[in-house]
Amino acid sequence: MRFAIVVTGPAYGTQQASSAFQFAQALIAEGHKLSSVFFYREGVYNANQLTSPASDEFDLVRGWQQLNAQHGVALNICVAAALRRGVVDETEAGRLGLASSNLQQGFTLSGLGALAEASLTCDRVVQF
């Protein structure tokens, strides 16, 4: 089965993103195809490369990045939600006159079209 995941919670502070990550790993372990993860609302904080968890905590941002690198899972970030929350790539930082960007490598700023496409091409869309 082909799956897509929607994450609406931040990397830390709620269980949503952590549960989504564990679900993603379980899907892959069971032989399912995880096509994409779409980060929306507070979920865009999962793509902030400046996140620095305590040394005894799992680094969820880098975990998502590894999921992308090892399994080719697309990590799409809602551009409107990201800009409102200060998560920007180099292009947007330049366009907005910001000093730097903070979008973690492996994540892509995208519109809601990426979510619509995932919902049309996948068998299941699961939201956390």
UniProtKB/Swiss-Prot annotation:
Enzyme class name: transferase
Cellular-component GO terms for this entry: sulfurtransferase complex
Active-site residues from the entry: C78
InterPro entries found in the cross-reference section: DsrEFH-like, Sulphur_relay_DsrE/F-like, Sulphur_relay_TusD/DsrE
An individual GO BP term: tRNA wobble position uridine thiolation
Entry's Gene Ontology molecular function annotations: sulfur carrier activity; sulfurtransferase activity
Record EC number: 2.8.1.-
Subcellular location as annotated: Cytoplasm
Pfam families: DsrE
Keywords noted in UniProt: Cytoplasm, Transferase, tRNA processing
Keyword Transferase: yes
Superkingdom to which the source organism belongs: Bacteria
Broad class of the protein's primary localization: cytoplasm
Quaternary structure annotation from Swiss-Prot or TrEMBL: Heterohexamer, formed by a dimer of trimers. The hexameric TusBCD complex contains 2 copies each of TusB, TusC and TusD. The TusBCD complex interacts with TusE.
Biological role stated in the UniProt entry: Part of a sulfur-relay system required for 2-thiolation of 5-methylaminomethyl-2-thiouridine (mnm(5)s(2)U) at tRNA wobble positions. Accepts sulfur from TusA and transfers it in turn to TusE.
Family per record: Belongs to the DsrE/TusD family.
Protein name: Sulfurtransferase TusD
